[in-house]
Regions:
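Tryptophan-anchored aromatic micro-motifs
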Residues: 51-63
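Glycine-rich, aromatic-bearing surface loops/beta-hairpins
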Residues: 160-209
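Surface-exposed interaction patches
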Residues: 130-134, 139-176
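Sequence-level preference for short, compositionally simple segments enriched
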Residues: 33-38, 76, 82, 95, ...
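Sec-dependent bacterial lipoprotein signal peptides
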Residues: 1-29
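Bacterial Sec signal peptide processing site at the extreme N-terminus
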Residues: 26-46
Length: 209
């Protein structure tokens, strides 16, 4: 099956990747180690991915380059359906320049791993291979690669994706984007569901204002 290339990610990351690749050759930069997921086991409120994202969710996000410069803003309407241990999560994006995009995740709950953490695997059209991760306490971390088409060539970037549940109806997402093992940017998203989401409905995905 042919993977759909994300034009949105391509435009976001192309200039940053070229710049950082040059810096890497000259300076040997490396990315920082992240938190050990298992250390968050006692954090609350507990996150269960399939129950949190079942039904309608709205989200607001930004993309920053590795230097902290704001590159893009966006909003998202999400709709999740659960069938047994499978969560199908549809995402519809509107960016601040008027561009639209969408993604559908199919996420499977695998059960507890040897480390005692609940494990998940997921697939989406613009993700190469399978995203894999786990949940501890109020946090989820999963890793995946996205293949972009740039100037007629394919380029793969890596996402180190963290979700932290803050309230029954609120979660914060921080995803670190890297290439050649070097962080090139980060995505921050706030997810709202329940009454918080209803207060913002209908979410305008036609016009940015």
């Amino acid at each position: 099956m042919t993977r759909r290339r994300s034009s949105v990610l391509r435009r976001l990351l192309q200039g940053v990747i070229i710049l950082v690749a040059g810096i890497a050759v000259l300076g040997g930069l490396s990315s920082c180690a992240r938190t050990d997921l298992a250390t968050l086991q006692d954090r609350t409120p507990q996150l269960e991915l399939e129950s949190f994202f079942a039904g309608e969710t709205v989200a607001f996000g930004i993309f920053e380059d590795r230097f902290g410069n704001l590159r893009r803003q966006f909003r998202v309407a999400l709709n999740g359906t659960v069938d047994g241990d499978v969560l199908t999560l549809e995402e519809f994006f509107l960016y601040d320049d008027g561009e639209k995009d969408q993604r559908t995740w199919v996420i499977r709950k695998l059960g507890k791993g040897e480390d005692g953490l609940m494990r998940y695997a997921g697939n989406a059209a613009d993700v190469t291979g399978t995203a894999r991760g786990g949940i501890a306490g109020n946090a989820m971390n999963w890793q995946y690669d996205v293949v972009l088409s740039m100037s007629g060539q394919e380029l793969e970037v890596h996402f180190d994706d963290w979700i932290y549940r803050q309230h029954e109806d609120v979660a914060i997402n921080r995803a670190y984007v890297s290439k050649f093992g070097i962080e090139i940017g980060a995505v921050t998203i706030v997810f709202l569901r329940g009454d918080a989401a209803k207060a913002l409905q209908p979410l305008d995905l036609e016009n940015w204002s």
